[in-house]
Amino acid sequence: MTTTAPFLTGNQIRDRFLQFYAQHNHQILPSASLVPEDPTVLLTIAGMLPFKPIFLGQKQPDFPRATTSQKCIRTNDIENVGRTARHHTFFEMLGNFSFGDYFKEQAIKWAWELSTKVYRLPPENIVVSVFEKDDEAFKLWEEMIGIPPQRIKRMGEKDNFWKAGPTGPCGPCSELYYDFHPELGEDNIDLEDDSRFIEFYNLVFMEYNRDAEGNLAPLQNKNIDTGMGLERMAQILQKVPNNYETDLIFPIIETAANIANIDYQKATEKTKVSLKVIGDHVRSVVHMIADGITASNTDRGYVLRRLIRRVVRHGRLIGIEGQFIKQVAETAIELSENAYPQVRERESFIKGELEREETAFLKTLERGEKLLAEIIEKTETQGQISGVDAFTLYDTYGFPLELTQEIAEESNLTVNIEEFEAEMRQQQERSKAAHETIDLTVQGSLDKLAEHIHPTAFLGYTDLQLTAKVEAVLIQGKTVDTAEAGSEVQIVLDQTPFYGESGGQIGDRGFLTGENLVIRVEDVQKESGIFVHFGRVERGSVSVNDQVTATIDRACRRQVQANHTATHLLQAALKKVVDKSISQAGSLVAFDRLRFDFNCPRAVTSEELQEIEDLINTWIAEAHETEIAVMPIETAKEKGAIAMFGEKYGSEVRVIDVPGVSMELCGGTHVKNTAEIGLFKIMSESGISSGVRRIEAVAGPAVLEYLKVRETVVKDLCDRFKIKPEEISDRITTLQSELKTTQKELEAVKQDLAVAKSDQLLTEAESIGEFKLLVSDMGEMDAKALQTAAERLQQKLGEGAVILGSIPSEGKVSLVAAFSKKVNQEKQLQAGKFIGQIAKICGGGGGGRPNLAQAGGREPSKLSEALLTAKEQLTESLK
């Protein structure tokens, strides 16, 4: 008997996945941040990324089984977003993971049970693939699950064999596909046919280790890594033609369509692509900003900026002028806030960042349009804009090729697409390595270096300055013999006092010096025991085998270790005040601030935050000595030392003990006495994902700086309003009330003016047979007042048509059409269609109901022409 899968919302799909695996003893873990701890990738691009050190055997997990819904960002196929049914930049990956616990048989059994019993997918609609040599998986699917062999497809290594890199953990995988058209039969199943099949669940069986010769040896601990795309499962269960029309994304698309006065269902394919891009990208930017990413010209900040700019560009392509992203972002926030409450809590920050970027890019686009005008002028006689010029506009000014083509077409010019695509391919080749895959191996050069040099000896717990030998010099990740002054370098030493970033603590800063040599070290990272010092050669040159003096910045180190010990005190205070079951989910320990993420199902109250702050400052004032000891891990656990999930611990561990207050396993640097911290101040508490909270704080001298800024703001407010500090809150409430009243009064005045002006225009209406026609330029009247005037005029005129236009103060065109019911029925005229066509004269578009519609344009100089055309056409049509 054929079953029918029930409709489930995106939230229901996510919850049922997590609860299913929780019932099978999997620990539900919150989504990691989109900012990964892994320095080899810019963004979290897969559900397994947070577990990478566990899969590589570098860390021991606290749980043998885990399940997550992980936020992910991928931009390697950004040009396909909106053009295919399933490409996205932002997506959620549902996953279940086994760390040396269950393996292939159980993973397959649960995947089938989840798919057919929980989601109730018809078994006859599921096709699976296995690695061509994985007879065990084939047999399990056929004999244990009962899938007919013709619906089990053997695939090659390219499709169904996962590997970490040239060497390391690897294994076959098995994928579950949904068949939208099982009636086509099982004779010629082609899983590449994405109009019929969609892959929705991937099971990776990590069971081998590949050596340098390519030989495979069984792993001692076999792991399971799976991924189910939430958006793909939503498409299947909600029975929509693509991921974009699911309840996870489509409300965002609808918001953008409404702003542009577009009916999505009736829109052209080109317009739908732009709306889908907006829907996808807005999800990305909202979550990126919520996770602390800000727009910039480098690294993940550039990814954010690029996505925001693409939203603006596609908005212009569908006729949206001016700022609009904040409105669309509000819908994205509404859709995500239940699963990821931090998007609502950081709403003002998200919208502020979007507004700043949108404003700046609109100015950039104006400059791009000017440059395009110059290019058109110089190429008019040639009949074609070069691909190089088009790519410069695209790459430097963010000017989309489609927009360049449209504007060029108006001047009877084409664009050299082949040349443009050649430039694009060159750029993609330069950048694809940073985005394509997760690299679970040591970065290229370091991988080779590790074969020739020993791990760096870290002596920085006791030595803040020492002499060391230069083992390697790298520029842009490539080894060189010598680096000259001005070079940005990465230096590997045989021993170092510099702490390498780990455990949330940033790397030390300082200098490497020698005879006529100065290298300013700005950061230190470590990979597989090798410490890499990132810096700039400020004087002289540095070569392999040179002797240098390595000196850390003591002031920075003091502040970092004060913040690190303060972080331990913060966790202890949270356990004491809020809930003893609270555990660390992440942290940042910098020289100027600290951040602590922790598992907690609710917000910490303001009263609790004050109690936590007071308790920490009490511990600081009590001047507790910090005791640091190395001991067997079992001894540390017996003493009650706190360990963090996901961290790798050896048989011997380093324990940081503030007697009677806190005891944690930690490899970071710390104060000798809590009194060295000085002061502690909580700046904020917020949610960053479902069940995970974040506290940001400052300690030591940074507290005084923080309070100084606050004091300056308070003093400025008191001086400006001639009030006392304790009166500020009441004054703000009063001002808000007055502003709200004033805004209402202003709106009423605008409406009164619109009514008055519309009454004056009644005498200008012309009679055309049994109908009245009024077409008028309303000056700078805003869009809302324009609509009020049009509706009132049409009601007073009776049977007929009213067309009004204006150029509001922000400099864009607004148009309104109001038609009587008789005009709709007898003359077959629709206000929406009519005003949409007229708006094209002003370089815009719009639409609406048959009796009332609005439109806009971006060429105010053509308003008179548009109104004249409207009058001529209606005069003819109403006869």
Curated annotation (Swiss-Prot):
It comes from the Bacteria. It catalyses: tRNA(Ala) + L-alanine + ATP = L-alanyl-tRNA(Ala) + AMP + diphosphate. One of its GO terms (molecular function) is aminoacyl-tRNA deacylase activity. It is found in: Cytoplasm. Its EC number is 6.1.1.7. Its cofactor is Zn(2+). InterPro entries: aa-tRNA-synth_II/BPL/LPL, Ala-tRNA-lgiase_IIc, Ala-tRNA-ligase_IIc_anticod-bd, Ala-tRNA-synth_IIc_core, Ala-tRNA-synth_IIc_N, Ala-tRNA_ligase, Ala_tRNA_ligase_euk/bac, DHHA1_dom. GO terms for cellular component: cytosol. Zn(2+) binds at residues 564, 568, 666, 670. Binds 1 zinc ion per subunit. CDD domains: AlaRS_core. GO terms for biological process: alanyl-tRNA aminoacylation. Keywords: Aminoacyl-tRNA synthetase, ATP-binding, Cytoplasm, Ligase, Metal-binding, Nucleotide-binding, Protein biosynthesis, RNA-binding, tRNA-binding, Zinc. It holds the Pfam family tRNA-synt_2c. Catalyzes the attachment of alanine to tRNA(Ala) in a two-step reaction: alanine is first activated by ATP to form Ala-AMP and then transferred to the acceptor end of tRNA(Ala). Also edits incorrectly charged Ser-tRNA(Ala) and Gly-tRNA(Ala) via its editing domain. NCBIfam families: alaS (TIGR00344). Consists of three domains; the N-terminal catalytic domain, the editing domain and the C-terminal C-Ala domain. The editing domain removes incorrectly charged amino acids, while the C-Ala domain, along with tRNA(Ala), serves as a bridge to cooperatively bring together the editing and aminoacylation centers thus stimulating deacylation of misacylated tRNAs. Belongs to the class-II aminoacyl-tRNA synthetase family. This is Alanine--tRNA ligase.
